[in-house]
Amino acid sequence: MRSKIKLSLIANKTSRRTTFRKRKGGITNKLHELTTLCGVKACAVISSPYENPVVWPSTEGVQEAVSMFMERPATEQSKLMMSHETYLQDKITKETKKLESLRRENRESQLRQFMFDCVEGKMSEHQYGARDLQDLSLYIDHYINQLNSSVMLLTNNGASSSSFPPPLHTSVAGAGAGAGAAPLVVAGAGAAPLAVAGAGASPLAVAGVGAAPLAVAGAGPPMAQNQYEPIQPYIPTAFSDNIQYQAPVDFNHQIQHGIYDNLSLDPNHQYPFQDDPFMEMLMEYPYEQVGYAAEHAHIPFMNGNYYNYHQPPTVGLTTTGHMPSNNATTTTTTNTTVV
Amino acid sequence: MVKKTLGRRKVEIVKMTKESNLQVTFSKRKAGLFKKASEFCTLCDAKIAMIVFSPAGKVFSFGHPNVDVLLDHFRGCVVGHNNTNLDESYTKLHVQMLNKSYTEVKAEVEKEQKNKQSRAQNERENENAEEWWSKSPLELNLSQSTCMIRVLKDLKKIVDEKAIQLIHQTNPNFYVGSSSNAAAPATVSGGNISTNQGFFDQNGMTTNPTQTLLFGFDIMNRTPGV
C-alpha cells in the first residue's frame, strides 16, 4: 500500500533532487497527454536551484503560447490565473465546504439514531449533554414537519389510515354472554376495526379509519371524513356496585413533576423512563392518552396488539345502577353484521 | 457485486473525437496537472509556470510564486523589485501554512467519510431488523405517520425539559429569562448551548436562526430576554 507523503519541503537534498527529476518528468508527461487527448495548446517553464530552466514543449512553443496569452485582455488573463497561494486557498475552501456537508450528514444520522433509540427506550445507552438534547429537539421538529407533509400528501391522495390487510374472519367478542354484556367487535370495511355497542348498552359513535363514517346505535352526527380520532369511552377499572372510571392522565404534569425529580449528569444514573420503551410509557393509558391511529399502528412494544384489529378488553358488566341489567328472560343473542 | 467504474485502463493517447468526453477529460486532467504542480513546488522548492488553453478557448494558468514573475524572467525582462527575497520568503511561509491547513482539512474529511461509511454499513446490516418507525417518513402510511407525530411530540417535551434541567445543573446561577442577569453566562451563547459532555462532536448542527430560541435569549444582543 502506498504511504502518504507529507506536504512539506523534503529535507534531504539528495532525495529532493531525485524527487524533482522524477516529478518534472511526470508533469511534462501529463502535459503531453493533455495536449494530445484534448487537442489544446499548453506550455510550462520549470526552474530550480539544481539545473537550468526547463521549457516544455520547446522554446518556440512557449513563446507562441506566451504571445497568445498576452494577446488576451488583461481581465481574461487574470480571471483564471492562479498562483500557488490562491490555488491552495481555493482547495481549502472546497474541502471545508465538503467537510461541513459531511459533518451535517453525519450529525443528522447521529441525531436520527439517538431519536429512535429514545423512542425505543435506549436513552440510557447514550451519553449526552445539553447541546445534544437541544440539537435533538430541533431534529425532532424537522422530522415532525416531514411527517406532517407526508400526512398531508396521504390525506390529499385519499389514503386509508390503516394499511393492514382485512382479517380473514369476523371476530365477535362475548356474543354468548347476553345482550349488552360485552361490546361486539366487528372488523369493518377497509380493515378499520369498529366497536359496535351491544344492544341495550349506552350508545357510542365510532368511525372506521379511512372508511365512511358510521353512526351506531342512535349516536350523534357522523364524524368528519378527515377526523381520525373517534370518541373513546373510559374503560371501567373496578367492577363493583359503584363503578369507578379511570381518571385521564395529565401527561405533561407527570413529565414536569414526576420524571425529573432526581436528575443526574451521571450517564449510569437511571431515570424512570430510560429502561422502559418510550412508546410503552405513552401507551400506559391507551384509551385516555393516545388517539385511534396510535392504537392501530401495530407497534409491538406499544400495546401488545399483534392482530389486525383492535380488541378492547372484554368486560363482564354486572348488574349496577349505571348499566342496563342482564335480564335472563329477555336476553336474545343477536348476530350483528355490519354492511 | 457490479463494478461502479471501469477501473484503470490503458488510454490510447490520440485526440478524442467526442466533444462532451473531451471537455470532461480536459477538466479532470487539468485539475490533476495543477495538483501535481502544486505538490512539486512544495516538495522540491521549484518554480513553475504553466499556461493551458481549453477546448472552449479559455486560458488557464498556474504559477509558483506566480505566473508573471516567471514569464518575465523567461522573456528576459528584469523586474525591479528591491524586496523580492522578502516577498519570496513571505510567500514560502504562507504556502507552508496553507499546505498545513489543507492537510488538516483533508484528514478531517477522510475521518468524516469513514464515519459515514461505517454508519451506512451498520444501516445495511440492520436493514432486515429495522422496525417500521425507522423508515423514511415518506414510506409510512397514514396511521403510522399520525402515531409517530404523537410520539415525537411527547418525546420533544421530555427532551426540552431535560435540556433545561441539564443547563440548571451545569450552571445553577443561571435563571431562565431573568432580567437580573447582566450578561449571558459562559455556558450559553445566544440561545445556543455550548456545554456538551456528550458523545456527539462539537461541530454539530447549527441552530437555525429562525428557530424559537430557548431560555429567553435574544440572538441579536445576546442578553437574556425579560
Curated annotation (Swiss-Prot), chain A:
Gene Ontology terms for molecular function: cis-regulatory region sequence-specific DNA binding; DNA-binding transcription factor activity; DNA-binding transcription factor activity, RNA polymerase II-specific; protein dimerization activity
Subunit composition and interactions: Interacts with AGL61/DIANA and AGL62.
Its job: Probable transcription factor.
Coiled coil spans: 86-112
Compartment(s) of residence: Nucleus
Record GO cellular component, one term: nucleus
GO terms under biological process: positive regulation of transcription by RNA polymerase II
UniProt key word NADP: no
The protein's name in its UniProt record: Agamous-like MADS-box protein AGL86
Keywords for this protein: Coiled coil, DNA-binding, Nucleus, Transcription, Transcription regulation
Species for this entry: Arabidopsis thaliana
Swiss-Prot record, chain B:
Keyword Nucleotide-binding attached: no
Localization annotation: Nucleus
InterPro entries: TF_MADSbox (IPR002100), TF_MADSbox_sf (IPR036879)
Region named Disordered: 108-131
Coiled-coil regions listed: 95-132
Entry function: Probable transcription factor that controls female gametophyte (megagametogenesis) development and chloroplast biogenesis during embryo development.
Protein name: Agamous-like MADS-box protein AGL23
Origin species: Arabidopsis thaliana
Organismal lineage: Eukaryota, Viridiplantae, Streptophyta, Embryophyta, Tracheophyta
